[in-house]
Amino acid sequence: MASLGLLLLLLLTALPPLWSSSLPGLDTAESKATIADLILSALERATVFLEQRLPEINLDGMVGVRVLEEQLKSVREKWAQEPLLQPLSLRVGMLGEKLEAAIQRSLHYLKLSDPKYLREFQLTLQPGFWKLPHAWIHTDASLVYPTFGPQDSFSEERSDVCLVQLLGTGTDSSEPCGLSDLCRSLMTKPGCSGYCLSHQLLFFLWARMRGCTQGPLQQSQDYINLFCANMMDLNRRAEAIGYAYPTRDIFMENIMFCGMGGFSDFYKLRWLEAILSWQKQQEGCFGEPDAEDEELSKAIQYQQHFSRRVKRREKQFPDSRSVAQAGVQWRNLGSLQPLPPGFKQFSCLILPSSWDYRSVPPYLANFYIFLVETGFHHVAHAGLELLISRDPPTSGSQSVGL
């Protein structure tokens, strides 16, 4: 993976951050080691949580683990070259081995819980499928949509059909890089936000990883640029309202996917600090804050619009300590739907096995259960990339506000 000057980007940015970070800067080896230790400690706690809940985690959750495992390989190689980071490099190696073992063990449970889904998407669990960026760019604010459209036509089922066509893993023995007219329309539809937008980005990221270059897939980078510009806009909105809990999952997912897309401006030190603060120290997962913040309460009070949330397979753990938080569907991050009467909130949530929102009563499907991922890959992308980059940014990239 190419190095880039995220350190200089953070120090030389023309625009001041919305909130400054209390983490040490990255201008010395000592400060890099301090932050690296914080990140690794968070990932190690999350790994313990993963190992304890492995039979309950679905394929989507394990895909995130695979992405992190690939990331750790690059991190270990680079940290081994710096004396102060060498001990941490050994920890990275041990963590990577644990994650690889967890992925292999998970295949047994996935074959039992959802064999069809595993057959269709097992390719994304294979080593080498996820290719880390070799060059870095920044989002272009001029590509942000003036308004977001309705998400009614977007669903997990339709998205899965398109992804299977692209991978070529369907039962019809189709070749990879397939693209029907329906999928072309769905995956290039303008005005998407939230999980609709992240599904679109995922489609074109996978197209690039599969080497698909026919038709609209020849313009994969153009669509990736478009989608990540809008995901950056949504992340800034989430930051502006104080990282209200219902926005955190998509906030982290945007960092992961656009980081994989090569957008260095998603790696902000203050965003890393925020993500690290969301981890439950004892449990290791990333879940519901202890108390609702003022911004969330205000947003809920004044919300007017919402749209159905499209999130790849998720579910509560059976021994969670309270009823699921019925969550939010939003067209923008200021539109938050309040909880249905009688619903409480989780303290720890994850991407587990086989729960599907399509099987719940209609009123719950409309609100949809809001769950949050373990954060393995999100913390890695928001943090580890900050620590393995060195090359100074170009003059164009310096103009991007962090």
UniProtKB/Swiss-Prot annotation:
It comes from the Eukaryota. Glycosylated. Keywords: Glycoprotein, Secreted, Signal. It is found in: Secreted. Predominantly expressed in thyroid tissue. GO terms for cellular component: cytosol; extracellular exosome; membrane. GO terms for molecular function: protein homodimerization activity. Coiled coil: none annotated. Residues 1-20 form the signal peptide. Belongs to the UPF0764 family. Homodimer. PANTHER family: UPF0764 PROTEIN C16ORF89 (PTHR33539:SF1). This is UPF0764 protein C16orf89. It comes from Homo sapiens (Human).
